Amino acid sequence: MPIPALVAAPLLAVALAAVVTFATPALLRWLPVPPDEGEVAPFVTLATPTFRAAVFACSAVAGGIAFACLPPAHWPAWVGLVSVGVLLGLVDLRTTFLPLRLTYLAVALAALGVAVSAWLRADAWVLVSAAVAGTLGAGFFWLVWRVSRGFAFGDVRLAGLIGIVVGTEGRAFAFAAFFLGTLVGALWALAVRRRKAADEPFPYGPALLLGPLVALLVTRLLLPG
């Protein structure tokens, strides 16, 4: 990676993390309480200093990994995932909910970023690849949800978001991202189930979101070329 990009990558990651952290209270206030879940505290109650520090740290690390591993023309496609997507994962971790509005915001940012990335790369097939991966990712998780009910429907929508982003890096990378995210989720679920009841809700979203980042580290840093 050229020296200017090496400097810009961490700066952009920190800047995005600062923006999403600053916006966290307003975004959480914007989210309605799930209507069919009984007594659930408003999402804005999550916006404690500790939670916001976690948002900043996780977003900065996620952005740093993505931008360090990829050429600058690829960065826009990842902006939504490493900012609002990270907030979405932390909300899921704390509440086991993946709020619809926040998911759609992340999808909108990802779609816009993919369009910008395709333009910067002068490659319209980036749009096609992102659309196909998003559809296949959501479709596969919908099928699993339909058959087993092993996770909530919010994870189906999240898979679509992830597919849109990882699809810009090609079929092999998209497969690796979903495989690694599913593997992390399975191992995490096994560890959690040892301490909790089998029917207790499990936050699968954070594991899915880790998949693309682990795939980047493995394919770009540990296995270059």
Regions found by a protein language model. Give the residues of each.
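A membrane-topology feature that recognizes alpha-helical transmembrane segments
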Residues: 1-225
